[in-house]
Regions:
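Short, polar/charged alpha-helical segment
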Residues: 35-60, 172-178
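Contiguous mixed-secondary-structure segments that line small-molecule binding/active-site clefts
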Residues: 47, 83, 88-187
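Extracytoplasmic small-molecule ligand-binding "clamshell" domains
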Residues: 44, 48-52, 58-85, 110
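Short helix-initiation/N-cap motifs at beta->coil->alpha
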Residues: 62-75, 168-172, 183-189
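Residues at or immediately flanking beta-strands
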Residues: 25, 56-60, 164
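Extracytoplasmic "Venus flytrap"
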Residues: 27-44, 64-68
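Short, low-complexity disordered leader/linker segments with a strong preference
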Residues: 1-25
Length: 189
């Protein structure tokens, strides 16, 4: 399973707005386009959040990686230039190696298992531990299953021997490719 995280800077309080109160902008960024479920989810979140806070907050969405690659988005959160980002687990893994477990290969049997494992509080302490890096992981999401695409059929790990396998910028994924007999090549995020 491909698993990612949603990071947030600061704490937001949903309370009413008076006419004198300033609207607070929440900037959220990710690398997917406007047709992707991440965009639709953030658009729905923004509309609901704005309504529930009586317009005190407004969510501005930056899709398509327009604010930079995913590692940069975490840095923008840390500096306050961005309030939310949707990134793969490899981004917080760059700050805390314990995040490798969240997106570890073959950890989950299926989507239901992933949801059961990630939405029941098991990772709450890990998510909260990122506050020392000036961001907080709010939740995880699934991006489907990881696949290997090749010009030849891949039926077993033997078929991967010597192949260059594109992976996220994660020591876990590079090592996974190596253990399967291939060579992990980090791709841009």
């Amino acid at each position: 399973m491909a698993v990612g995280v949603i990071c947030l800077m600061g704490m937001l309080t949903a309370c009413g707005r008076t006419s004198e109160q300033k609207v607070t902008e929440i900037r959220v960024a990710f690398n997917q386009n406007e047709n992707h479920p991440q965009y639709r989810a953030m658009k729905a979140f923004g509309e609901k959040f704005e309504k529930e806070t009586n317009g005190r907050y407004h969510v501005t969405i930056y899709p398509n990686g327009v604010l930079g690659e995913q590692g940069a988005m975490a840095e923008f959160i840390r500096t306050g230039a961005l309030q939310m980002a949707i990134v793969p687990c490899s981004v917080p893994e760059g700050y805390d190696a314990d995040f490798a477990i969240v997106g570890a290969p073959y950890l989950y049997d299926n989507i239901d298992h992933l949801e059961k494992a990630t939405l029941n509080g098991v990772f709450d302490d890990l998510f909260a531990s990122t506050e020392k890096y000036k961001f907080r992981v709010l939740t995880v999401y699934t991006a489907g299953e990881r696949n290997v695409y090749a010009k030849k059929p891949i039926n077993s790990a033997d078929d991967l021997k010597g192949m260059i396998i594109r992976v996220n910028d994660s020591p876990t994924y590079v090592e996974m490719a190596k253990l399967m007999g291939g060579n992990g090549s980090v791709m841009a995020q």
